[in-house]
Regions:
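Alpha-helical assembly-interface signal, strongest on the long, hydrophobic N-terminal helix that forms
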Residues: 1-75
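Short, conserved structural patches
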Residues: 60-144
C-alpha cells in the first residue's frame, strides 16, 4: 500500500477517483431506493385507507341487527375511486385496473398501478410506477 501511495505514475489518484465514484454511485442508489420505498408506503397506506373507508361507508345497515352484513358493491367501487383521488398527494397518479367485490361476505379488492416522482427527478424527468393490490372486508366479530 505504501508503495502505491508513493508511486508518482498517478495510479493512486486513479484508484482514489474510482473508489470515490463507486461510493457515490452506491450512496445514490441507496437514497433512491429508500425514497422509493417511502413513496410506495405512503401510496399504499392511502389506498388501503380508501378501500377500508369505501367498504365501511357502503355497508347496508338494514340487516345489521340480524347479523347479516351486505355491501353495496357498486357504491363501494365509486367511493374507493373518489376517496383515493381526494387523498392522493400532488405528483402521485394512480390507475385502477380492476375492482371486484362481493355483497355477502362484504369484501372489496382493487388492483392497479401508482406512479410517483423519483427522488432525483429534478435531475431528469423520471417517475416510478409500481403495482398495488388492496383488499378490505367487513365481518361481524361481536361473538353472538
Amino acid at each position: 500500500m505504501r508503495r502505491l501511495l508513493r508511486d508518482r505514475a498517478g495510479s493512486a489518484t486513479i484508484l482514489f477517483f474510482g473508489l470515490f465514484f463507486a461510493l457515490m454511485l452506491f450512496s445514490f442508489l441507496v437514497l433512491e431506493m429508500g425514497g422509493t420505498m417511502e413513496h410506495y408506503d405512503r401510496a399504499q397506506t392511502i389506498l388501503q385507507r380508501s378501500i377500508n373507508s369505501a367498504v365501511e361507508a357502503n355497508m347496508d345497515e338494514r340487516y345489521r341487527a340480524d347479523r347479516v352484513l351486505r355491501l353495496n358493491v357498486e357504491g363501494a367501487k365509486a367511493s374507493f375511486a373518489a376517496f383515493a383521488a381526494e387523498d392522493m398527494p400532488e405528483g402521485y397518479t394512480f390507475t385502477v385496473q380492476s375492482v371486484t367485490g362481493t355483497a355477502d361476505p362484504p369484501m372489496l379488492t382493487a388492483k392497479g398501478t401508482v406512479t410517483f416522482p423519483a427522488l432525483f427527478s429534478p435531475f431528469g424527468d423520471r417517475s416510478i410506477t409500481v403495482g398495488y393490490t388492496v383488499r378490505a372486508a367487513n365481518f361481524a366479530v361481536d361473538g353472538r
